[in-house]
């Protein structure tokens, strides 16, 4: 299948640069995956599409302020590191900018010396393995010195860091937010629970690969990046019981979806586990556990629009995106939402 089949026209002004004042007032496009019928709602109306006994699956990862800007020891030359994943206690795989400054053995300082770093390895893909030196707890040091790694298409400064976190974020480790979850408020989640709808959590730490363009012509030739996931025994039992009852599993976001589909066996059962996934879901894939999906509007030719098209049908999804552009929906991380029912 050709990557170009997932291209669409998107005016730049529809790329949301900031979140709405109230999370759940974003617009919601409801797409019937069987008929292709579209309705236009607000996100707080999502509760009307969930039934007692259904389970909503949320990704509780938390975005780290993983962008560090510092100086090279001795010369004062600027360096920027973006932390991607921890490889040992104080060693992280990072992107470095400018790369030529980040050679093995080079040392850097951040925040008046509160944090120091040394490049210990350059990987084949150009990423650096960096060892950090500090006093106290690394996460607290990072919290005081780091900046949020916003997506490349967001050009405005984010005034409130928490607006790039879900209200239920808990497990530190992501380089990007699981953006479908940004629409939920604590009040809306309480209302959902009060209606007898279950809430289960997965953890998938979103990597920067989520923003990387597909650089091949044929979908089947694309290789996905790997991301760490975890599912607890308790949450696995809630999901399995939902399927057994004949209720629906509604996945919030492509990250929750990829986690569940990685873990599920052929009968759609999930179990407590953790690991790394590079699952690539594109048309032809048969879903094992996810019945419905809440998601944002994604980039043209992205692996995310391919996943959405797998659940709802490519023709239905491309028609829906055309309608979203016509109706001036807001796109990408801080944009509006779609519910595939």
Swiss-Prot record:
Entry GO terms, CC:
cytoplasm
EC main class here is: transferase
Which pathway, per its entry?
Answer: tRNA modification; tRNA-queuosine biosynthesis
Pfam families named in the record: Queuosine_synth
Which GO biological process categories is it annotated with? queuosine biosynthetic process; tRNA wobble guanine modification
Q: Which InterPro entries match?
A: QueA, QueA_dom1, QueA_dom2, QueA_sf
The record's keywords, sorted A to Z, are: Cytoplasm, Queuosine biosynthesis, S-adenosyl-L-methionine, Transferase
- GO MF annotation, one: S-adenosylmethionine:tRNA ribosyltransferase-isomerase activity
Q: Which domain of life is it from?
A: Bacteria
Q: What Gene3D superfamilies is this protein classified in?
A: QueA-like (3.40.1780.10)
Record EC number: 2.4.99.17
Reaction(s) catalysed (UniProt annotation) = 7-aminomethyl-7-carbaguanosine(34) in tRNA + S-adenosyl-L-methionine = epoxyqueuosine(34) in tRNA + adenine + L-methionine + 2 H(+)
Name where it's found: Cytoplasm
Protein family = Belongs to the QueA family.
Q: What does this protein do?
A: Transfers and isomerizes the ribose moiety from AdoMet to the 7-aminomethyl group of 7-deazaguanine (preQ1-tRNA) to give epoxyqueuosine (oQ-tRNA).
Quaternary arrangement and interactors, per the entry? Answer: Monomer.
Name the UniProt record assigns to this protein: S-adenosylmethionine:tRNA ribosyltransferase-isomerase
Question: From which organism does this entry originate?
Answer: Clostridium botulinum (strain Eklund 17B / Type B)
